[in-house]
């Protein structure tokens, strides 16, 4: 069986950055990890309608800085920054240190795997035909400059008795090329028939120079060895 490695995990440190960037000693590591998890859980639930793509957590000098990548920054910020201030206070309480929240706008949500997957799952919950939702997502991504996209849905599609998996692909999605910038994410649609899983891979092109290339010295030309003739 051809099982696939996680496209983001295998590219960490090559072309993909980490979502949490901090260092801690052995004593503090578990607490930091636990508060990271709780902060992500809270923000994901609180901003479920704000089209959040990524949450990046940093911990500079006894504080916590959260960068929210969203396609709808107005919803996160709220009137005169009221909503973001409420979020900051809760995050500070969870982490137990002063908190800072930054907002980063996602310019092209059609090229973000998480936002595309969430869009498809919300359409499935509204009883849109799964093939139509998949094709629309693929066409929008290709129109905005994606080199390739693959969308997969699995579950009781169309209310069928037997669960199945269907996928649709356009362009190239080279999963084995480590320098390929592949954005991968998943989402779930909670329908009356059960849960339908959605997976999205978006290939945006190759990142050259992600890591310093080491030039290999050319091997010196070696004299050819004469072959001995075997005895007859």
From Swiss-Prot:
PROSITE patterns (alphabetical): KH_TYPE_2, RIBOSOMAL_S3
GO molecular function, one term: mRNA binding
Keywords: Ribonucleoprotein, Ribosomal protein, RNA-binding, rRNA-binding
Xref: SUPFAM superfamilies: Prokaryotic type KH domain (KH-domain type II), Ribosomal protein S3 C-terminal domain
Gene Ontology BP terms: translation
Pfam family, one: KH_2
Annotated KH type-2 domain residues: 39-107
Assembly behavior: Part of the 30S ribosomal subunit. Forms a tight complex with proteins S10 and S14.
Record-given protein name: Small ribosomal subunit protein uS3
Gene of this entry: rpsC
């Amino acid at each position: 069986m051809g099982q696939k490695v996680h496209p983001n995990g295998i590219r960490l440190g090559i072309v993909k950055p980490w979502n949490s960037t901090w260092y801690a000693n052995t004593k503090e590591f578990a607490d930091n990890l636990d508060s990271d998890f709780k902060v992500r859980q809270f923000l994901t639930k609180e901003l479920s309608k704000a089209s959040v793509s990524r949450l990046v957590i940093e911990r500079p000098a006894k504080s916590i800085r959260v960068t929210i990548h969203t396609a709808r920054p107005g919803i996160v910020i709220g009137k005169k920054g009221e909503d973001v201030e409420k979020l900051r206070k809760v995050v500070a309480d969870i982490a137990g240190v002063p908190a800072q929240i930054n907002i980063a706008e996602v310019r092209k949500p059609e090229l973000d795997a998480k936002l595309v997957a969430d869009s498809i799952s919300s359409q499935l919950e509204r009883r849109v035909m799964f093939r139509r939702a998949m094709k629309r997502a693929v066409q929008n991504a290709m129109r905005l400059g994606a080199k390739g996209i693959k969308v997969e849905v699995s579950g009781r599609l169309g209310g069928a008795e037997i669960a199945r998996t269907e996928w649709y692909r356009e362009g190239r999605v080279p999963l084995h090329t480590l320098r390929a910038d592949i954005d991968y994410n998943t989402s779930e649609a909670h329908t009356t028939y059960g849960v339908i899983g959605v997976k999205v891979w978006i290939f945006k092109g190759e990142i050259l120079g992600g890591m310093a290339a080491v030039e290999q010295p050319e091997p010196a030309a070696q004299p050819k060895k004469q072959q001995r003739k075997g005895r007859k």
